[in-house]
């Protein structure tokens, strides 16, 4: 019986040495929201708490300025 190998999660922002997450960096922010528009929790992404707070604030600012959608495209 094979054991399940879980990959270790790491914080991408710590590894890259990011000081501040910018709300205008849409490509980065899109990778942290689901296709329905929800913010992905840090227990799934592995983001540290400090950067998760910055990330959620940046996503909310980008949504307010219509850079990111609140929800997916309704058909």
From Swiss-Prot:
Any GO BP annotation: translation
Keywords noted in UniProt: Ribonucleoprotein, Ribosomal protein, RNA-binding, rRNA-binding
Cellular component terms per the entry's GO annotation: cytosolic small ribosomal subunit
Pfam family, one: Ribosomal_S18
Disulfide bonds: none
Keyword Transcription listed: no
Keyword Ribosomal protein: yes
An example molecular function term from Gene Ontology annotations: structural constituent of ribosome
UniProt-listed HAMAP family: Ribosomal_bS18
Function: Binds as a heterodimer with protein bS6 to the central domain of the 16S rRNA, where it helps stabilize the platform of the 30S subunit.
Subunit structure: Part of the 30S ribosomal subunit. Forms a tight heterodimer with protein bS6.
Protein family per UniProt: Belongs to the bacterial ribosomal protein bS18 family.
Protein name: Small ribosomal subunit protein bS18
Gene from which this protein is expressed: rpsR
